[in-house]
Every structure is written in C-alpha cells, then in structure tokens.
Amino acid sequence: MKITILGAGSFGTAIAIALSSISTSINLWGRNHTDMQSITINRKNLKYLPTYELPDNIIPSSSIDEVLSDHNTCIILAVPTQQLRTLCLYVQQHIFEQTPLLICSKGIENISLKFPSEIVKEILPNNPTYILSGPSFAKEIAANLPCTIVLAGENEVLGTSLINKMSNKTFKIVYSKDTLGVQIGAALKNIIAIACGIITGKNLGNNAVASVIAKGMEEIKTLYTAKNETINLSTLIGPSCLGDLILTCTTTHSRNMSFGVAIGQGEDINKMLNKKSEIIEGVSTVKPLISLAEKLNIELPICTSIYNLLYKNVSLDKTISEIL
C-alpha cells in the first residue's frame, strides 16, 4: 500500500508515523524545500514534532511531481482549511482520477463559506472524497497512543476498504456517511475551545467549563439543523462531535484552548496571533462561521461572542458574561 500525505505540519507528520506500520511507502509532501530537506536529513520534523523520529519508509519531498507520479492507495490532504483550495488547484493536474482523497482540514472557508469536502469536490470532482476527523492530538498519534477517529464519505464500500487497510491496534477508524455533521463538529469545536480556555484562564472553575461545552454542543446542533433537516444522533454523540469537543475543550494541549487560556490570563490577542507559528483554527474559522450563521438566519451565541472579542474589540469581561 502506498499513501501520499500533502501537508507536512504536525498532523500530517503524525499521520505519516501512525500509518508507517501498515504501509509499504508513505510520501510526506511539504511546499517548503528547506523544511523538507531538514526532515530528510534529520529524520524528524524539527519545526512541528521535534521529538518523534520518522520511520525509514516515510519519504519527505517538496516535489509534487515526485510524490504523485504513481498511483496511490489514497491521498491525505493535511493542510489548514484556508489553504485547501490553493493546494487542490496546485495538484489538480497531478492527481489520478478515482484516487480517494482523505481530508483532515477542519473549518469553513472564507468568502465561499464552504466546508472542506465542498472545496475539494468543486476542484477535484472525479475523486472520491472523505473526511478524516475526530479527537486526535498529533503528539499522541505520533507516540502511538490509542485513538479512534472517523472516516466520513458517501461510498461505504470504498470507505470500509480504506478503514480495513489503514486501521491498526492503536489507530482505529470508524465509518460514517454523515460528512456534513462530522465537518460541523470539527469546525465549531475549535471556537468553543477558545471560550473554554478563557474560562479556565480566568480560574472560573470546571463547572463553568462544562456549562460552556454543553452550550457549545447546542450550537453545533443548531448549525447542523440549519444545514440539514435530519440530524444523525450517532454523529453528535460520536468521536467527531462530542468526542473531539471534549478533548479540545479540556486540555491545554489544544492550541485553541491554550490560546483562550492566555486571553483569560490577560495576554494581548494581536501580539499572540503574530507570534504563533501554527494556525489557531478557531480564530480563522469564526469569521466565516458568523457570516454563514447570518446567511442561515441562526444564532450561535458563544461563537458570536468569541467573534466580537477577536474582531470587534468587545471587552473580555463582557465576553465572559455572554459565554456564561
């Protein structure tokens, strides 16, 4: 089995390590030639996962021709949502039709207000598209610690075949047809995590955090209902919604929650954003989310409060009172 991962950040690298035990060859592609040379020489991604060594069957490369010249069992797209369209356009002429595409991006695209699967299907309509999502910190995946994530897509036969090929004892994948529900949970949980981080940073207690998580789940349900009349309960209470929401909202290993904690402790938001080397998905998602909510005529109180804090200069005290 041959797999290509497009995106050599922390998650793309971790997935490569996790799948190295069941794949004969894994291409790990990144656009930055210097970074990929460093990974090749050091056998570590010093920029994002510096303590984890890459097995020998992971082949780092910055050449898209090189990694996509042959047929792949699947191609994993592991870039932030706001970079996904650019990536798809860049590789459009290189990807073989009918090669399954597994999308790890979480969020909503600016301007178009599209979810990741909608972006990919627009540009690469002849490739089966799946969402790979769930509670999965990159460092824990790279350390071979157990996790369960979801593969969501329309073709159950192909999806099940991919799951059988890619799952192992610690990296478990379950199937879902609910592509939309999985993506809604993945998008909103990062914003809710910022809110939970603020509450934690202000030392307002675990009860308050639990309350915000519950309210956040209601906002996921509100958007889900507005986009799709039929709610799949197993999605809401499964790994990709409830599971990922709990994980992201309850530990500072989450970039989104730790960002919120820093805000709660009085750090300057703009200074933090300028210093961050990795994208805070909740920050980049909240603006298109609020535009989508206005378009759908729905109210998402917590997400709106975080948007107003980040982009409308609403005070922290007012934000906290609204969140609670």
Swiss-Prot record:
UniProt main location, coarse: cytoplasm
Class of the enzyme per the UniProt entry, highest EC level: oxidoreductase
GO molecular function: glycerol-3-phosphate dehydrogenase [NAD(P)+] activity; NAD binding
GO cellular component: cytosol
EC number(s) reported in the record: 1.1.1.94
GO annotation, biological process: carbohydrate metabolic process; glycerol-3-phosphate biosynthetic process; glycerol-3-phosphate catabolic process; glycerophospholipid metabolic process; phospholipid biosynthetic process
Functional pathway: Membrane lipid metabolism; glycerophospholipid metabolism
Keyword GTP-binding: no
Keyword Nucleotide-binding carried by entry: yes
This protein's UniProt keywords: Cytoplasm, Lipid biosynthesis, Lipid metabolism, NAD, NADP, Nucleotide-binding, Oxidoreductase, Phospholipid biosynthesis, Phospholipid metabolism
Pfam families: NAD_Gly3P_dh_C, NAD_Gly3P_dh_N
Active site (record annotation): K189
Binding site for NADPH: S10, F11, R31, K106, A138, R255, I279, E281
Stretch forming the signal peptide: none
Catalytic activity: sn-glycerol 3-phosphate + NAD(+) = dihydroxyacetone phosphate + NADH + H(+); sn-glycerol 3-phosphate + NADP(+) = dihydroxyacetone phosphate + NADPH + H(+)
Binding site for sn-glycerol 3-phosphate: K106, G134, S136, K189, D244, S254, R255, N256
PROSITE patterns, sorted: NAD_G3PDH
Subcellular locations according to the entry: Cytoplasm
NCBIfam families attached to this UniProt entry: PRK00094.1-2, PRK00094.1-4, PRK14620.1
PANTHER family named in the record: GLYCEROL-3-PHOSPHATE DEHYDROGENASE, GLYCEROL-3-PHOSPHATE DEHYDROGENASE [NAD(+)] 2, CHLOROPLASTIC
Function recorded in the entry: Catalyzes the reduction of the glycolytic intermediate dihydroxyacetone phosphate (DHAP) to sn-glycerol 3-phosphate (G3P), the key precursor for phospholipid synthesis.
Family membership noted in the UniProt record: Belongs to the NAD-dependent glycerol-3-phosphate dehydrogenase family.
Protein name: Glycerol-3-phosphate dehydrogenase [NAD(P)+]
Gene that produces this protein: gpsA
